[in-house]
Amino acid sequence: MIYDIPDKNVAYIAKARELYKNRDKYAYLYGAKGQKCTSEVFEALWSAEPNYFKKYSAAQKAQIKAFCLGKTVIDCSGFINLVTGKFMYSTAYINSCSNITTPDKTKDGDLLYTTFGGKGRHIGLDIGHGFFMHCGKELETISIDVIDGFGWEKGGRI
């Protein structure tokens, strides 16, 4: 244990940093959990979530597809799956956490969760010093952002 951070949390941060170093190999795609993106995989994932993807035009779809092809595609919980070695969705992760707390009280390696006021769901990993790592939207990969102001509703330890 480093200070009051459990060893598994230290390991989660180390794994997240490793993934971040290789972030160009990853692409965000809603519903993806670590598949290698081929045309078939892309179309299957796109077809599985018509209500989510209807916001994109045909031209935007083509741009997103070109960005994803050949990469490993993940969404936010897919990123956490790679970090933890578990397989869950964002809500299941936060519901399985101990030490549920407010985002300002999370510790390094804890999860952060939001529903964006009921408009969706998102999960990320507190990596310390006021930052978190996540995979959050199309045409992007694994990224690091500031915790404050993101709209996190709660956090917890897995």
Roles of regions detected by a PLM:
Residues 1-77, 81-86, 117, 133-135:
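N-terminal capping segments
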Residues 109-110:
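Structural motif
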Residues 1-27, 33, 89-103, 115-158:
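Aromatic- and glycine-rich peptidoglycan recognition patches
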